[in-house]
Amino acid sequence: MIQRDRLVNDFEAMSQFTAPGEGINRLAFTDADWAGRQYIIDRMVDAGLTVETDGFGNVIGYKVGKNPDLPVVMVGSHTDSVPNGGNYDGVVGVLSAIEVIRSMNDDGFEHDHTIAVVSFMCEESGRFGDSTLGSKAMRGALTVQDLHRLRDKQGTSLYEVLKGRNLHPDEIEQVEYKRPVKSFTEIHIEQGKVLEHDQKRIGIVTGIAAPERFYVTIRGNADHSGATPMNL
């Protein structure tokens, strides 16, 4: 059975891993984010998971099933935040997955498929202006060139940041997850107001907006917008 007190304690602990400011400030690969990542690793180990990390820093904890040759059932989310973020966005998906594992251990529940609890790194765009980078790395959709191109407001490249955390940016294309995956499930906060408005406790997502980001260069002259004809 799910133990509410364990989850409450975990959320409270994670809320302490933040830089100063309002809300949660746990931008990807900062000291606060790295400390939160270690907390997640520790909780996975406590739950009996076999923990692995990849060259991008993604964390995967395995609970081996009765038939380890079957495709894995993957659950999880991320724990980095946007500036002035909340304590549940992403975090609820990781901590709830760990709590499910703890509850299965308590109940002696056996399962056929191996379960993989995943905490993706750098899923928010708050630091490098691009999102879902950890999951892109696991899909083989991130290149060394991308790591050099993506920079934070201080001009530090993602490549340099990964090096600073003793990760392996030059091997980023080897991070691609090779094991067959049966399914991926993520518990997430509602980022809109539909469930709240309809007084529903939970919803199943069947579609989601997919943002696109473009780099645009506009060339021209600065002139008065009301008095300058376009042909001049």
Regions found by a protein language model. Give the residues of each.
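Active-site cofactor/substrate anionic-group-binding motifs, chiefly glycine-
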Residues: 51-87
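Thiamine diphosphate
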Residues: 28-48, 71
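N-terminal capping segment at the start of a domain
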Residues: 1-30
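Alpha-helical metal-binding/catalytic segments enriched in His/Glu/Asp
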Residues: 75, 84-123, 212-218, 224, ...
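Midchain, well-structured core segments that form catalytic/ion-binding scaffolds
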Residues: 122-123, 129-232
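Short coil-to-beta-strand
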Residues: 7-10, 68-76, 210-217
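Glycine-rich, flexible beta-strand/loop modules in the N-terminal catalytic cores of phosphate-handling
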Residues: 22-30, 47, 220-228
